[in-house]
């Protein structure tokens, strides 16, 4: 839910500085999750609103603009996967956004003023996918790369060559780089999620995430199986095409055999833009692919050149984003469900309504405070939209439609799953069930234990966990390692092959390093990063279980609250018995690293940032070496940074380090220190 922003003109200088810094940090985090991890933390409309607020703040208070601000960079921060890096010949810019016709009219007025007269526009549908650059040499596809941070992307050539829509050879022997969008058609997305659910895997949240995750696979067979498609819409080298307009470029792309969207339209006045937007707002669900807006581009390429670009966006184009589609429905009931950590969450059960192409009947109400703020009662008529076209969310209650017999919700006092008394922990908004034997928590906890970022037991998703619990084959994480093929064959949809495959995955998970096991145990407030820091420090699960609050809290990056949660978890007889059973099943309980961290290392406890291209080592290798020597390797520079190691072509991070007075080393200084440390 969006915060209520104080009008900018009413902010004090100090308030503006604090809010700007907070939004800069928050949006970097959200951008990294969206662009790098393909796992958005917030819906698009929330990100867009926060970003627009930051732009407005930085325009009013330019003294608070920093090089690392999301407004100064395109896309994600430095990429971090195993895919090879590619430097783009020209920056891959993103588009500026507007969210209303008034804002679009303002953009048109500025553009017309800059050009001196009204120019024709080419209108295109905004495809909801992943930006890609395709390089052809003598008509042959030789390279494909993602946007990345706009300057450096990832090489996905092998993956892109599996996409049937993208030709490996053009109809003419041109040497040219073109850009476009890779997407997953709606039918492919529905089929993929149906198969994933049948396999007991988590379904993808939306086609965009599915496309991004599919394209960045290290196994090209997976990419090929996902039935991706693409549209091409841009080149920075129009002279190679012999065209003078954007609409002409699209026609030439098609002649070359490249896939293009044929819904573009050239218009001469703003009223036609509104008609085009209205047309595709109503027709978007009938398209075979997802769109989230309309792109308006100055059609004449020479005028595009005259208008130019900012550091982040072109001045000659703008994206109009569709508002979330809304529908009216009635709240029939409010149900309360229990999560992995015992948080009890209300969910609205509503009359089914068709929204953004799917039938929606449920929406999360988050917590009792949210319910009170929205004043939602059973029987109310409410507006419903999909936040980011993904997550159903109630907008507001239509009070004039409230029936006289509407029912005020009843906040439960006992757990809906196990009937234990619920508690309200000070400082938290959620109600919580603290019964360790709660059936709902057990199912959620087992699913978490098997998840990809924990023990990574492929094929053991929520459906399979539910079946195993119902059959009485498992009761806690230790019992997972006692499942047999014979037991699995009694469950729905299991055959010999799938049963053996799951048992193999369970056995493979026994060899995981300690940090995965720690994270998988589901200890409150212990995420993947905290689990790694703790595993590195204590090396064995036994040592962690015997550590004091002070011992754990002394780890750089682990606070007192997390330490208390860990000690409390391991203090129970049930947890102690669990460790014994895991050990007897052969589950590794040690940190698997060849290096014992030397607390006397120069890097121990220091926050280090790597930037630029390293010539003598890869970024992942340097990161691992630093972590093995006790450093906390961060992705951005702040006042808490102890050291920046700068390779070739270091950019904004180096500039910020200089501004803040942070110590900066060359790569050679780092290598010299490595030699010294390794020779101890």
Swiss-Prot record:
SUPFAM superfamilies linked: BRCT domain, DNA ligase/mRNA capping enzyme, catalytic domain, Nucleic acid-binding proteins, RuvA domain 2-like
Catalytic activity: NAD(+) + (deoxyribonucleotide)n-3'-hydroxyl + 5'-phospho-(deoxyribonucleotide)m = (deoxyribonucleotide)n+m + AMP + beta-nicotinamide D-nucleotide
Domain BRCT: from-to ranges: 598-680
Known EC number: 6.5.1.2
One of the record's GO cellular component terms: cytosol
Alphabetical list of PANTHER family matching this protein: CHROMOSOME TRANSMISSION FIDELITY FACTOR 18, DNA LIGASE
Stated name of the protein: DNA ligase
Originating species: Leuconostoc mesenteroides subsp. mesenteroides (strain ATCC 8293 / DSM 20343 / BCRC 11652 / CCM 1803 / JCM 6124 / NCDO 523 / NBRC 100496 / NCIMB 8023 / NCTC 12954 / NRRL B-1118 / 37Y)
Gene giving rise to this polypeptide: ligA
């Amino acid at each position: 839910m969006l915060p209520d922003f104080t009008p900018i003109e009413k902010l004090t200088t100090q308030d503006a500085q604090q809010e700007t810094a907070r939004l800069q940090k928050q949006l970097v985090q959200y951008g990294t999750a969206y662009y790098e991890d393909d796992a958005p933390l917030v819906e698009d409309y929330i990100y867009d609103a926060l970003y627009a607020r930051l732009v407005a703040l930085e325009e009013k208070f330019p003294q608070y603009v920093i090089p690392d601000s999301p407004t100064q960079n395109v896309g994600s921060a430095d990429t971090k996967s195993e895919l090879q890096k590619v430097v783009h010949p020209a920056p891959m810019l993103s588009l500026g956004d507007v969210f209303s016709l008034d804002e679009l009219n303002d953009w048109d007025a500025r553009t017309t003023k800059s050009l001196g007269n009204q120019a024709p526009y080419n209108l295109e549908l905004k495809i909801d996918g992943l930006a890609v650059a395709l390089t052809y040499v003598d008509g042959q596809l030789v390279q494909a790369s993602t946007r990345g941070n706009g300057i450096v992307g990832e090489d996905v050539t092998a993956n892109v060559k599996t996409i049937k829509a993208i030709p490996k050879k053009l109809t003419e022997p041109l040497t040219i780089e073109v850009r476009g969008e890779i997407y997953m058609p709606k039918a492919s997305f529905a089929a993929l999620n149906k198969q994933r659910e049948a396999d007991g895997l988590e379904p993808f949240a939306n086609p965009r995430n599915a496309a991004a995750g599919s394209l960045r696979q290290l196994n090209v067979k997976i990419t090929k199986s996902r039935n991706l498609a693409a549209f091409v819409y841009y080149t920075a080298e129009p002279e190679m095409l012999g065209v003078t307009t954007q609409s002409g470029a699209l026609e030439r792309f098609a002649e070359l055999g490249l896939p293009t969207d044929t819904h573009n339209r050239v218009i001469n006045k703003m009223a036609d833009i509104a008609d085009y937007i209205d047309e595709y707002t109503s027709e978007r669900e009938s398209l075979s692919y997802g769109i989230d807006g309309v792109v308006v581009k100055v059609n004449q390429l020479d005028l595009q050149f005259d208008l130019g670009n900012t550091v982040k966006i072109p001045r000659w184009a703008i994206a109009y984003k569709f508002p979330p589609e809304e529908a009216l429905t009635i709240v029939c009931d409010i149900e309360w469900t229990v999560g992995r950590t015992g948080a009890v969450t209300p969910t609205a059960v509503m009359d089914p309504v068709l929204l953004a192409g799917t039938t929606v009947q449920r929406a999360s109400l988050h917590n009792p405070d949210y319910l009170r703020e929205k004043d939602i009662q059973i029987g109310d008529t409410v507006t419903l939209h999909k936040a980011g076209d993904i997550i159903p969310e109630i907008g507001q209650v239509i009070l004039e439609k409230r029936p006289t017999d509407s029912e005020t919700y009843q906040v439960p006092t006992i757990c809906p799953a196990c009937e234990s008394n619920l508690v309200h922990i000070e400082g938290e908004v959620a109600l919580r069930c603290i019964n360790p034997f709660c059936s709902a928590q057990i199912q959620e906890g087992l699913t978490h234990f098997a998840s990809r970022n924990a023990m990574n037991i492929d094929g053991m998703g929520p459906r399979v966990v539910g079946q195993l619990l119902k059959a009485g084959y498992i009761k806690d994480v230790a019992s997972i390692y006692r499942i047999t093929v014979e037991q699995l064959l009694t469950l729905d949809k299991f055959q010999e092959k799938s049963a053996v495959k799951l048992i193999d995955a369970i056995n493979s998970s026994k060899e995981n390093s300690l940090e995965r096991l720690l994270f998988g145990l589901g200890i409150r407030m212990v995420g993947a990063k905290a689990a790694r820091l703790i595993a590195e420090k204590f090396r064995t699960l036994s040592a962690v279980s015997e550590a004091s609050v002070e011992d754990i809290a002394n780890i750089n990056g682990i606070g007192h609250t997390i330490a208390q949660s860990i000690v409390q978890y391991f203090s129970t007889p049930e947890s102690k018995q669990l460790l014994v059973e895991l050990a007897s099943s052969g589950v590794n309980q040690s940190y698997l690293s060849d290096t014992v961290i030397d607390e006397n290392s120069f890097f121990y406890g220091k926050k280090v940032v790597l930037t630029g291209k390293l010539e003598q080592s890869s970024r992942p290798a340097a990161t691992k070496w630093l972590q093995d020597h006790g450093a906390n390797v961060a992705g951005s520079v702040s006042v808490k940074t102890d050291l920046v190691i700068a390779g070739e072509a270091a950019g904004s991070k180096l500039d910020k380090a200089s501004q803040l007075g942070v110590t900066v080393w060359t790569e050679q200084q780092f290598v010299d220190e490595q030699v010294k440390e390794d020779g101890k």
